[in-house]
């Protein structure tokens, strides 16, 4: 499919996940996709070889990594981003009383502060394109399950 001239950056595009599926869907619709992964070995092979797809290494917990991703997208798009999909996230399944506080902080950093940091960093490109943001969430907010209390409080 020819390019629409629109771009999307999706965090958390490791093989087999929702992000990889979203990246493939956007690519098929004609978007230039910036599919991000922390570990390049986990990038889906079908995306690595697809036209209009750029695999970016991005650790959403690192300000330096986020800044490097902004620079890469800016150079490739002329300073525009049409869609940002904050998809990175994680949960911990265990009783709250067994949760290590440091692990809980890391979970909260990943699920709350990281999407906010990515949004703030890409905001100028989104504003320039009159773009939009999609923040991936979970059914866990509506469907209580045992041993997910720490996940429920991290947006």
Residue map of PLM features:
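Active-site helix of classical SDR
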Residues: 119, 154-155
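Hydrophobic positions on the long internal alpha-helix
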Residues: 66-69, 85, 118-122, 126, ...
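Conserved NAD(P)H cofactor-binding loop of Rossmann-fold oxidoreductase domains
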Residues: 87-92
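Residue(s) in the substrate-gating loop at a strand-loop-helix junction
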Residues: 138
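Rossmann-fold cofactor-recognition segment
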Residues: 49-64
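Canonical Rossmann dinucleotide-binding motif of NAD(H)/NADP(H)-dependent dehydrogenases/reductases
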Residues: 2-34
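Substrate-binding pocket helix/loop in short-chain dehydrogenase/reductase
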Residues: 95-96, 103-107, 130
């Amino acid at each position: 499919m020819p390019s629409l001239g629109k771009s999307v950056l999706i965090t958390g595009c490791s093989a087999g996940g929702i992000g990889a599926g979203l990246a493939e869907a956007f690519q098929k619709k004609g978007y230039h996709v910036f599919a991000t992964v922390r570990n390049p070995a986990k990038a889906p092979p079908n995306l690595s070889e697809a036209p209009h797809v750029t695999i970016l290494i991005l650790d959403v917990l690192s300000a330096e990594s986020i800044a490097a991703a902004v620079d890469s997208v800016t150079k490739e798009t002329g300073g525009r981003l049409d869609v940002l999909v904050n998809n990175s996230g994680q949960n911990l399944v265990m009783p709250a009383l067994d949760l290590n506080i440091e692990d809980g902080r890391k979970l909260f950093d990943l699920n709350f502060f990281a999407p906010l940091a990515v949004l703030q960093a890409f905001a100028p490109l989104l504003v320039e394109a009159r773009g939009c943001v999609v923040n991936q969430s979970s059914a866990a907010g509506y469907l209580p399950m045992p041993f997910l209390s720490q996940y429920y409080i991290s947006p």
